[in-house]
């Protein structure tokens, strides 16, 4: 489970 980009993208929301 490695959500690097997702974490950043979701972080904006």
From Swiss-Prot:
Entry comment describing in which tissues the protein is expressed: Expressed by the venom gland.
Keyword Secreted on entry: yes
Main subcellular location of this protein, as a coarse class: secreted
Location of this chain's protein in the cell: Secreted
Any one GO CC term of the record: extracellular region
UniProt keyword terms in alphabetical order: Amidation, Pyrrolidone carboxylic acid, Secreted
Residues recorded as bearing Pyrrolidone carboxylic acid in the entry: 1
Residues where Phenylalanine amide is found: 13
Family note: Belongs to the tachykinin family.
The name this protein goes by in its record: Tachykinin-like peptide-XII
Natural source organism: Phoneutria nigriventer (Brazilian armed spider)
